[in-house]
Amino acid sequence: MITPLHRNILARHKSSLNGALRVLPFRSRALGVSRNVFVYEPPNMRNLSDMHLLYLFRGHEREFVYIDEDDSRSTTTIEDLDALISSGQIPPVMAVIPGLTSIDGKRHSMGINSLLPSADTRDGLGSGQFWDFLTLDLIPYVEARYQSKLSGGFRLAAGFSLGGYTTALIATAFPGYLDHAGIYDGLFMFDAQTDIRTNAPDEIWLKSAVPDAALGPAETRSPEALAPWNPAELVRYADPVTMEEIQETMFWIRSAAGDGLEGNHDRCKYFTALLREHGITAGFNRIPLHPDARHTWHWNDRFIKLFLLNVFTG
């Protein structure tokens, strides 16, 4: 259902974009419910013969396009993308922004097939099979609908925080699809859910309430149950054929300046080192985006611009 907030977001972007922002009500067979997906179309898309495709992942579909998602930003991610295209700094890029949370944004699927499916389809999570929603429903639909314009373009994904985790999962569990994966302050898993800083069980993935909707309550979780959804383990234990496919994706990872309550620097550093250990290209050498970088939308939006400029002009 398109809400007043969706309409307000569309109204803002109608006057601020040279391209167009639309809401696609998408019926998912995997979820058994409809999900709203924001789609950004670059300027003059009807007359384009070729363009690139960018998926944006975080939580609720509004987050990349809602100016008041926090108090740090003066433009939205899509306004920044539109400006880069309109100024000729990057070629035309279409963006697809699926929601990964409940309708109220409070319960996060993380983009996986839930270990604890929702019992109430009214919350928007449906069956909880979000991995199937992404890889069996949404991606094939987008590829088929825009096939004539996407034939020669890059496939990109970018994610912030938990969306960074989802981006890494697409790149490692759906290997070979993405050409580039951009991740800002990603909430990465450690191998076997053991925090390398403390040699103790991971406080986020095994003990916190953050992943409850997808993983169930903390007392039911185990490293073994999470292994199929752990990008670190998918990299470390990949067979040779799968590793070659993962190596087709170039990763671009930066973090906030701090860790703990201030960001995910250590997790980003860990995952970048793991990629390089296995011959997977990581495009940035320095992990913190800036000495003042924070876990906010302003800094994520700065990262997205840097990521795209490096992909297309670096």
Task: Annotate each language-model stretch with its function.
Residues 1-314:
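Non-catalytic cap/lid and distal C-terminal segments of serine-dependent acyl enzymes
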